[in-house]
């Protein structure tokens, strides 16, 4: 058993160099994403299991495309991968093609042509850290019953969780030819028979390079910070993708506390001047999608003032 009481003694600079070397070894990295504003595609557990299995099948079909993480939501997906651009595009096209077949077979034909977006190339180490954190908290943002460490439909919950990875490494179940043909209406996937499954789907442990992705972070504490506290980086990615994400009171409060100390030289929001509160309220409203009630709670600002600034729709 790993001793989690032992703290890393590797100097910060050396840790960063190791992470940078890992990023360079990956080659070209990409963020595959589909439109957030889209009708419901996956609505049942069987739908989500089919989605998980399809990602696994595409990983087998494209062994030169390395999946670092992914999450499947009811109406959109996010994946972080490495590989040559044309192969990554072909991977994404296969995913969309067979998902359309699955939906048609369940009497819910949906045109997914809007999903064929050009993947966004990841620019540097900091960018890929932010993308992985963004993906691994995406399901948590849309499902209040989950956390970034428990949402079931993706690779997120296996990060820095060796016990769960070990548990998912053992299975007596596997995908059958009958299931593949019935689910995806094709004989082309017969070669994927025998993939081990847990509770009806292929575990991400068997087809995602989670250990490689973990080495892009200095340690588990660094990863936890990126997922749970670094909301400014998350907001930047959302703006680039044209997505809207929402934050909890605690996340927004941590952001405001940081602004109080760095820009206004006070320790707590109640100590801000009224003008400073109004300026921060605009940032929270326009950049972080905070509603008036959230802003009122965090900044101790009168709700009537906020309703006049941002009239309820």
Where are these regions (language model features)?
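Short hydrophobic/aromatic beta-strand micro-patches
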Residues: 80-82
């Amino acid at each position: 058993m790993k001793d989690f009481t032992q703290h890393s003694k590797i100097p910060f600079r050396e840790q960063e160099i190791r992470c940078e070397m890992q990023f360079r070894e990956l080659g070209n990295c990409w963020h595959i994403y589909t439109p957030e504003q889209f009708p419901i595609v996956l609505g049942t557990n069987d739908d989500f299991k089919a989605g998980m299995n399809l990602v696994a099948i595409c990983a087998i079909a494209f062994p030169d495309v390395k999946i670092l993480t992914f999450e499947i939501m009811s109406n959109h997906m996010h994946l972080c991968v490495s590989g040559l651009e044309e192969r990554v595009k072909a991977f994404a096209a296969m995913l969309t093609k067979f998902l359309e077949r699955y939906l048609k077979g369940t009497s819910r034909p949906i045109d997914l042509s809007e999903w064929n977006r050009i993947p966004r190339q990841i620019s540097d180490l900091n960018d890929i850290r932010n993308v992985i954190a963004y993906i691994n908290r995406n399901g948590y943002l849309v499902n209040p019953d989950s956390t970034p460490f428990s949402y079931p439909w993706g690779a997120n919950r296996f990060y820095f969780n060796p016990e769960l990875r070990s548990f998912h490494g053992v299975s007596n179940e596997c995908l059958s030819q009958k299931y593949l043909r019935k689910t995806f209406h094709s004989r082309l996937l017969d070669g994927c028979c025998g993939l081990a499954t847990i509770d009806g789907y292929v575990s991400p442990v068997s087809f995602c390079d989670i250990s490689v992705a973990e080495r892009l972070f200095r340690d588990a504490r660094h990863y936890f910070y990126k997922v749970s506290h670094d909301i400014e980086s998350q907001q930047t990615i959302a703006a680039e993708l044209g997505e809207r994400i929402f934050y909890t009171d605690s996340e927004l409060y941590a952001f405001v506390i940081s602004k109080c100390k760095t820009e206004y030289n006070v320790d707590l929001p109640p100590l801000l001047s009224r003008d400073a509160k109004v300026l921060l309220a605009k940032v929270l409203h326009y950049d972080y999608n905070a509603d008036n009630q959230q802003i009122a709670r965090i900044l101790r600002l009168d709700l009537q003032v906020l309703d006049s600034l941002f009239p309820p729709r």
